[in-house]
C-alpha cells in the first residue's frame, strides 16, 4: 500500500507548482494559492503514510522525482516551457532513477 500512497503523493506534488503558477495572475491569485496549499497538504499526508513502509530516503527521492518530471511535462504541455533534447534526457534520467529505487526496495 505504501507504493500506492507514494505514487499518489508524487502525482499530487505536481499540483502545488501549478497552483503557484496560477497565483501569478491577479485574477486567479487566491484560487492558485488555495490550490497550492491543498495539493501540498494532500501530497504531504500521503508521503507520511508511504514512509510507514518505505525508507525515508527512497520515499523522498521517488516523491520529488515524480513531482519534478510531472511538473516539467505540465510546464511544457500547458505553459509553453522551453524544451530541448538535453532537458528530455534529464527527465528520462530522473524517471530511470525513480524506477531503479523502486526496484531496489
Give, region by region, the residue ranges found by the protein language model.
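Polytopic alpha-helical membrane proteins, predominantly small-molecule transporters/carriers
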Residues: 1-105
Amino acid at each position: 500500500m505504501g507504493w500506492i500512497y507514494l505514487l499518489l503523493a508524487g502525482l499530487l506534488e505536481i499540483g502545488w507548482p501549478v497552483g503557484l503558477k496560477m497565483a501569478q495572475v491577479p485574477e486567479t491569485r487566491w484560487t492558485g494559492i488555495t490550490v497550492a496549499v491543498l495539493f501540498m497538504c494532500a501530497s504531504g499526508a500521503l508521503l507520511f503514510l508511504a514512509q510507514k513502509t518505505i525508507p525515508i530516503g527512497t520515499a523522498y527521492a521517488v516523491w520529488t522525482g515524480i513531482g519534478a518530471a510531472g511538473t516539467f511535462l505540465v510546464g511544457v504541455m500547458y505553459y509553453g516551457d522551453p524544451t530541448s533534447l538535453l532537458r528530455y534526457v534529464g527527465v528520462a534520467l530522473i524517471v530511470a532513477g525513480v524506477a531503479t529505487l523502486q526496484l531496489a526496495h
